[in-house]
Amino acid sequence: TEELEKMLAFWTGAGLKQVVVIHYDDEVGKQNLASVVDYLSKQGKQPKAISLQRNAKVDAKQIDELLKLKPDVLINTVLSGPAAEISRQISSRGLTVPMSSLSFVGAQQYIVAAGESGAGVSIAQVVPSATAQIPIVRECAKVLQDAGVTAPMNSTHLEACIGAKVLTEAMRRTKKPGNPEGLLNAMRNLGSYDTGGFIVSYGATKQHGSKFVELAMVSREGRLRY
């Protein structure tokens, strides 16, 4: 919800009116659509939407249907494959439609799949930039290097690394090692934990860890610009 609100606040603040949501035709997809509807209804606005089947290819007919909705901006909640295909097909028609995607899209996967068509798309990020000058970024970069990974660290790597560090800390605090319920209780009682310049917080009613959200734009060089 925080990611969707960040994207919608940006675009509605820029004066764009017709929001079109791209979502999966399943429970999670419908929840994403409902979040957008709820946010925009408070401004007296109503989004339009197009639903996709999971693991199905995006065809030209669906792009036709999407463009008939005359979007000012696309809010994407599907994975990198279909999102990239939509970007490529819109671009191949000589059109440009602003798009913002949930972090769920997988930034690096989208960038690779979309190619030049991905330039200008903004993607929500739930961790700091992979080039930020903070301890957790340096620590995770070293872990990847020590593991033999030669590619530059990206946001997906960093998010996984932070998750692993949080899980390791919870395991360290578990009173009964190897006990799933004990690990769950340790996570629930973790409280505020500084991973190294990036603080997460867990509790009985706090299970997301962080509300950090930034929008990063894909550059022409295929990099995320914060």
What does each model-identified segment do?
Residues 16, 118, 210-212:
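A structure-centric signal for secondary-structure junctions around beta-strands
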Residues 1-94, 130-138:
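Extracellular/periplasmic Venus flytrap/periplasmic-binding protein
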Residues 87-161, 218, 222-225:
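Extracellular/periplasmic periplasmic-binding protein-like sensory domains
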Residues 47-51, 121-123, 215:
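Conserved beta-strand scaffold positions in the cores of enzyme catalytic domains, especially
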Residues 10-14, 35-43, 65, 69, ...:
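Structured segments of extracytoplasmic/periplasmic soluble domains
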